[in-house]
Design a protein with these regions (language model features):
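Non-catalytic propeptide/linker segments at domain boundaries
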Residues: 2-90
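Short glycine-rich His-centered loop
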Residues: 87-107
């Protein structure tokens, strides 16, 4: 009987330790909220406020008040349907051969296509959307890398897919940004290195 009590106590302590460790890990991984901003219509109508608080404009692109119209944006209904049988989101890669500084040779999961797989699983499993993920290599023709024509090949292919799947409401051409070898587009969230995201 004493041995049984000892075993039960050990099991209980180890379970409590596991729950404590799990809670600590979850708290450490949680993203802390940013300070609250005044998001009144007047503030959102201010182009400089939007630019300074929500956007980073790359030096190779431009932005203007005409294409950052908050009032028009907020008036739109961006909600998606959650039908269980038809796709709502399409993900593809004009440049499927894009890799990262630490990608392993020949490992698809380390490429932008692998990022697409991960995004697909998040949108499907966590948010309940039906997602199509196209993995065609539009930037490889006859064994040669050709990124310039990839957009044309991808456009033709995606247009056909959209004709066959009119339920698709969002199309994402997912890329890894092309930058100089010594440039790393990362930021820090709660002390963890995190990739920056550009919506374009």
């Amino acid at each position: 009987e004493e041995e049984l009590k000892t075993n039960l106590k050990t099991d209980t302590n180890s379970k409590a330790l596991t729950e404590t460790e799990t809670t600590a890990a979850a708290q450490q991984a949680a993203v802390l909220p940013h300070p609250l901003l005044d998001l009144s219509p007047d503030r959102l109508a201010d182009y400089d406020f939007l630019l300074n608080n929500f956007y980073i404009v790359d030096e190779n692109t431009d932005a203007s008040a005409a294409n950052l119209n908050a009032a028009q944006f907020l008036a739109e209904d961006f909600s998606l349907s959650h039908g269980p049988l038809e796709p709502q989101i399409l993900i593809y890669h004009s440049h499927s051969q894009e890799t990262f500084a630490d990608s392993r040779e020949g490992e698809e999961s380390d490429t932008i296509v692998g990022v697409g797989d991960y995004l697909t699983s998040l949108l499907t499993e966590k948010y309940g959307y039906q997602v199509m993920h196209i993995k065609e290599a539009f930037d490889m023709m006859s064994g040669e890398l050709d990124r310039n024509k990839a957009y044309d090949y991808a456009c033709d292919y995606v247009e056909k897919v959209l004709e066959e799947n009119p339920s698709v409401e969002v199309v994402i051409d997912l890329h890894r940004d092309g930058v100089d070898e010594d440039r790393r587009l990362v930021t820090e969230i709660n002390g963890k290195t995190t990739a920056q995201i550009l919506f374009y």
